[in-house]
Amino acid sequence: MIERNWNELIRPEKPQIETGADASRKARLVAEPLERGFGVTLGNSLRRVLLSSLQGAAVTAVQIDGVVHEFSSLEGVREDVVDIVLNIKQLALRMHAEGPKRMTLRATGPGAVTASQIEAPADIEILNGDHVLCTLDDGASVRMEFTVQTGKGYVPAEMNRPEDAPIGLIAVDSLFSPVKRVAYRVEPTRQGQSLDYDKLIMEVETNGAVSPVDAVAYAARILQDQLQIFITFEEPKKKVEGEAKPELPFNPALLKKVDELELSVRSANCLKNDNIVYIGDLIQKTEAEMLRTPNFGRKSLNEIKEVLAGMGLHLGMDVPNWPPENIEELAKKFEDQM
């Protein structure tokens, strides 16, 4: 049975999630118990996918009035253009549409220019509005236009520069991943009396565009989708949960054997000697018939009546179509209802 390869492996419980004051950015997930070695296998795989493969939004280019290239400087701006571009790379964005999109910034001094001053379309959210882009002296002003796109992983500036780029357009290195940091460790954990299992502890930090819990879920879904192509066999059909079983014309408990009733030795021997095997055989007997059984007395009768009453049954019942021809097969099929 090929399904034993995966069915007999222990399955972890739903991950425990620990969050701090900012659940949208930082979380710790604990999954246990895992088979020995699966902590590293899953932890490393999830970490790599989290850092490289999740979709996000980032600035891919910027144009600054009065700037021809990134090695320029602006009068009245304390930072040079290289530093401004580095600050632009750290903008945390959430985009609800396909790119490219444009954002504009107009500011006058004195003071710090922050991301909250950027004019963005309705389908772009700026998640770190207090992030400083540059600092202006009194009387200085600046105007910038940003190009925002969606993507995954890291894309260098030269890949973001279009062939027909106008003079003054500065391509920006883009880190699209909303995940800023992923760390994991594996510790031994107990399952029953055995300590030979793994506990996976993952710490995930994002820029707020996606929660850490959702980020892990997306990474797991990516792995699931990629691994699916390696399953080259057809799995045995599973029984659908809740699938209706064929109806019995009697209570399934009647298929239970009388030696499972935990009767006294005397009562059990009397039933055995009278060839009473199933509860269905027993309940069709009347009290008078039972008392005519050799060595069967009133005490044994009361014991059996009490046990049957606990099952909602009694002696002297009429059971149509008893015994069924395939009684042993039916007993196995309806075992969970007995």
UniProtKB/Swiss-Prot annotation:
Keyword hit for Lipid metabolism: no
NCBIfam families associated with the record: PRK05182.1-2 (NF003513), PRK05182.2-5 (NF003519), rpoA (TIGR02027)
Function noted in UniProt: DNA-dependent RNA polymerase catalyzes the transcription of DNA into RNA using the four ribonucleoside triphosphates as substrates.
Keyword GTP-binding: no
Keywords: DNA-directed RNA polymerase, Nucleotidyltransferase, Transcription, Transferase
Region called Alpha N-terminal domain (alpha-NTD), residue ranges: 1-234
Gene Ontology MF annotations: DNA binding; DNA-directed RNA polymerase activity; protein dimerization activity
SUPFAM superfamilies xrefs: C-terminal domain of RNA polymerase alpha subunit, Insert subdomain of RNA polymerase alpha subunit, RBP11-like subunits of RNA polymerase
InterPro entries: DNA-dir_RNA_pol_insert (IPR011262), DNA-dir_RNA_pol_RpoA/D/Rpb3 (IPR011263), DNA-dir_RpoA (IPR011773), RBP11-like (IPR036603), RNAP_asu_C (IPR011260), RNApol_insert_sf (IPR036643)
Family (UniProt): Belongs to the RNA polymerase alpha chain family.
Family matches, as CDD domains: RNAP_alpha_NTD (cd06928)
Protein name as annotated: DNA-directed RNA polymerase subunit alpha
GO CC list: cytoplasm; DNA-directed RNA polymerase complex
Quaternary structure, from the entry: Homodimer. The RNAP catalytic core consists of 2 alpha, 1 beta, 1 beta' and 1 omega subunit. When a sigma factor is associated with the core the holoenzyme is formed, which can initiate transcription.
Residues spanning the signal sequence: none
Region of interest (Alpha C-terminal domain (alpha-CTD)), residue spans: 250-338
Catalytic activity: RNA(n) + a ribonucleoside 5'-triphosphate = RNA(n+1) + diphosphate
Xref: SMART domains: RPOLD
Domain comment as written in the entry: The N-terminal domain is essential for RNAP assembly and basal transcription, whereas the C-terminal domain is involved in interaction with transcriptional regulators and with upstream promoter elements.
Gene3D superfamilies, per database record: 5' to 3' exonuclease, C-terminal subdomain, DNA-directed RNA polymerase, insert domain, RNA polymerase, RBP11-like subunit
GO biological process: DNA-templated transcription
This protein's encoding gene: rpoA
Lineage of source species: Bacteria, Pseudomonadati, Pseudomonadota, Alphaproteobacteria, Caulobacterales
EC number, UniProt record: 2.7.7.6
Major enzyme class: transferase
